[in-house]
């Protein structure tokens, strides 16, 4: 049996590493295409990125859009987390909730996949509920040090990567992608 090849369009080395670890048994190749940053609902953003990526790659592509949503703020920063994190860092994200009793949040990951130009785009979403805490642990991957998933005493930044890759929003979305591949 040959491995299914997946062209994952990302410029984020840490995301690529996690996707490769979660999709063991697949041949994941990184394609670095500079995609536009779209605004809107996360599923719309993922679909637009997938359309743009397939036009550049001219073959099967997988793209991802990640959100970190604070319940006290009606879901913000949501899909704009990249910009918030760039400017505020994990400490600033935590401090955003200083005036709120509700520190609950959820991490959401939307993958969009298509076999090629003119083919349908399939969307796979995963969510991980948790709370925003003072940053702890490894600070090398985005907001991981300030997100503590429900049922755990550790932040994503403190967790063993194998544990994180079993429970994360990314792994939940990729589990749905694997199910799709098993059927198609």
Swiss-Prot record:
The lineage of its organism: Eukaryota, Metazoa, Ecdysozoa, Nematoda, Chromadorea. GO terms for biological process: deoxyribonucleoside triphosphate catabolic process; nucleoside triphosphate catabolic process; nucleotide metabolic process. Keywords: Cytoplasm, Hydrolase, Magnesium, Manganese, Metal-binding, Nucleotide metabolism, Nucleotide-binding. Mg(2+) binds at residue 37. Pyrophosphatase that hydrolyzes non-canonical purine nucleotides such as inosine triphosphate (ITP), deoxyinosine triphosphate (dITP) or xanthosine 5'-triphosphate (XTP) to their respective monophosphate derivatives. The enzyme does not distinguish between the deoxy- and ribose forms. Probably excludes non-canonical purines from RNA and DNA precursor pools, thus preventing their incorporation into RNA and DNA and avoiding chromosomal lesions. It is an enzyme of class 3 (hydrolase). One of its GO terms (cellular component) is cytoplasm. It comes from Caenorhabditis briggsae. ITP binds at residues 10-15, 49, 65-66, 82, 141-144, 164, 169-170. Gene3D superfamilies: 3.90.950.10. It is found in: Cytoplasm. Belongs to the HAM1 NTPase family. Homodimer. Its EC number is 3.6.1.66. Pfam families: Ham1p_like. Binds 1 divalent metal cation per subunit; can use either Mg(2+) or Mn(2+). CDD domains: HAM1. It catalyses: ITP + H2O = IMP + diphosphate + H(+); dITP + H2O = dIMP + diphosphate + H(+); XTP + H2O = XMP + diphosphate + H(+). This is Inosine triphosphate pyrophosphatase. Its main location: cytoplasm. GO terms for molecular function: dITP diphosphatase activity; ITP diphosphatase activity; metal ion binding; nucleoside triphosphate diphosphatase activity; nucleotide binding; XTP diphosphatase activity. PANTHER family: INOSINE TRIPHOSPHATE PYROPHOSPHATASE (PTHR11067:SF9), INOSINE TRIPHOSPHATE PYROPHOSPHATASE/HAM1 PROTEIN (PTHR11067). InterPro entries: ITPase (IPR027502), ITPase-like_fam (IPR029001), RdgB/HAM1 (IPR002637). Its cofactor is Mg(2+); Mn(2+).
